[in-house]
């Protein structure tokens, strides 16, 4: 994987815009409304295995990425239009778009750095174990490996 620059960073993904390889530039929607009231559990269980497509090739561009930050644990994007290829939608989080964010990462699934407004800073290796420090979205706080403390 090379550098991935896209809309919607995810701690365990390290910049979902890259989608594995190459450089992908995403056009963020003009406005995404985050839910005003969110029921975030004190302990959010991260999926044991993140849904990762077997395809390792990078698409030319990322159109839109809807992502969820659930109780300070950042899950996989729920919907992603990647050129003509759609990312898997079978994720553990509901398909609700969180606050706008910019993801910058090395590689696609598994490891890298994700930095953005609304999701904050995420650093993780493998999909589930990830250190996520974020502000905005569903919750604020610190989460590690799917377990985190957060408030909204």
UniProtKB/Swiss-Prot annotation:
Coiled coil: none annotated. Sequence repeats lie at residues 27-30, 33-37, 39-42, 86-89, 92-95, 98-101, 127-130. It comes from the Eukaryota. GO terms for molecular function: structural constituent of cuticle. Keywords: Cuticle, Repeat. The tetrapeptide (A-A-P-[AV]) repeats found throughout the protein are also present in many proteins constituting the protective envelope of other species. Component of the cuticle of migratory locust which contains more than 100 different structural proteins. This is Cuticle protein 64. The lineage of its organism: Eukaryota, Metazoa, Ecdysozoa, Arthropoda, Hexapoda.
